[in-house]
From Swiss-Prot:
Isoform 1 or isoform 4 (T+ forms) are expressed at equal levels with isoform 2 or isoform 3 (T- forms) in brain. Residues 27-57 are annotated as: Disordered. Unknown for isoform 4. Csen is involved in calcium-dependent transcriptional repression, regulation of potassium channels, and perhaps in processing of PSEN2 and apoptosis. GO terms for molecular function: calcium-dependent protein binding; DNA binding. GO terms for biological process: behavioral response to pain; negative regulation of DNA-templated transcription; negative regulation of transcription by RNA polymerase II; potassium ion transport; regulation of neuron apoptotic process; response to pain; sensory perception of pain. GO terms for cellular component: cytosol; nucleoplasm; nucleus. It comes from Mus musculus. This is Calsenilin isoform 4.
């Protein structure tokens, strides 16, 4: 096999692939799926994404225990509207 000379075209080709992973803009569907969460937009070149239920097209539902409000909790109709939303004059 012949070795190709290391010219600008081969450098551009090798740099192009790594650059694409970083600079590809998200499609509108990706932006909707990811929302405003941080730390998801960039993946180092050469590493594959881990398979999670969210990436498989299913939304991950966090299971949370819902506690009933305590006796000192204010219900919506008990909140003073002046204290909550002051009017601007």
């Amino acid at each position: 096999m012949r070795q190709l000379p290391a010219g600008p075209s081969s450098l551009a080709c090798s740099g192009c692939k790594a650059g694409r992973l970083v600079t590809v803009p998200f499609s509108s569907r990706d932006a909707e799926d990811q929302g405003s969460r941080e730390g998801i937009g960039w993946q180092p070149p050469g590493r594959s994404w881990a398979h999670t239920t969210e990436q498989e097209g299913k939304h991950q539902v966090a299971k949370a225990t819902v506690h009933p409000p305590g006796p000192d909790a204010l219900l919506l109709n008990q909140v003073d509207p002046v204290q909550c939303c002051p009017t601007r004059l």
